Amino acid sequence: MRPAHCGITPEGWPCIGLTGFSALVFAALGWWPLALVFLVLCWFSMHFFRDPERVTPRGEGLAISPADGKIIRIEEKADPFSGEKRLCISIFMNVFSVHVNRSPVAGTVEDIRYFPGAFVNAAFDKAATDNERCAYSLRDADGKLWSMVQIAGLVARRIVCRTDVGDALERGQRYGMIRFGSRVDLYLPEGYVAAAQLGQQVFAGQCVVARARQS
């Protein structure tokens, strides 16, 4: 499924502008090797900060992926807010993934917590507790609490939060991003099961990763 439109995130324009302008300056001076280097950097910045439109699935009892990437873990872990054991789906984003994060369900943001930390490889187990991260608690229309955690990685050094406590998010709505390779953990509430498989490539705002358990 191809997006109808592919824009650029607001965070990307300074980097794109700087590298693009530098390429033009070096080209005007006849310094072609440097111009080529900055042209490549400009292209990479445009690719990294791309923000394609996505068609979000409709239907009751569905949760869509909060991030582009590969599912590297589906396991029970302690929720960052309640401490209770809940099923967690971990999605690893490499530097070539779209890094805009989207809400898995419609709901209201109840809590946001930032944790300073290290920058080890986001694919490692200890990244969930040791790395810099930002956790969000979201209550859906049925009163169920969802938790999403943005985890900075080995290269990623900035987590971007675009929402506040009390904000109402739609399913698939953008709520933030992480720069240059990272991970998002999605904690499911009771009554939901994983609808994606380990190793599966998923796309934020588009792929269903969990659904309500059939009674």
Curated annotation (Swiss-Prot):
Its EC number is 4.1.1.65. The modification Pyruvic acid (Ser) is found at S182. It catalyses: a 1,2-diacyl-sn-glycero-3-phospho-L-serine + H(+) = a 1,2-diacyl-sn-glycero-3-phosphoethanolamine + CO2. It comes from Desulfovibrio desulfuricans (strain ATCC 27774 / DSM 6949 / MB). This is Phosphatidylserine decarboxylase proenzyme. Its main location: membrane. NCBIfam families: PRK05305.1-2 (NF003678), PRK05305.2-5 (NF003685). GO terms for cellular component: plasma membrane. The active site is at S182 (schiff-base intermediate with substrate). InterPro entries: PS_Dcarbxylase, PSD-A. The record marks G181, S182 as: Cleavage (non-hydrolytic). Its cofactor is pyruvate. One of its GO terms (biological process) is phosphatidylethanolamine biosynthetic process. It is a peripheral membrane protein. Disulfide bonds: none annotated. Pathway: Phospholipid metabolism; phosphatidylethanolamine biosynthesis; phosphatidylethanolamine from CDP-diacylglycerol: step 2/2. It is an enzyme of class 4 (lyase).
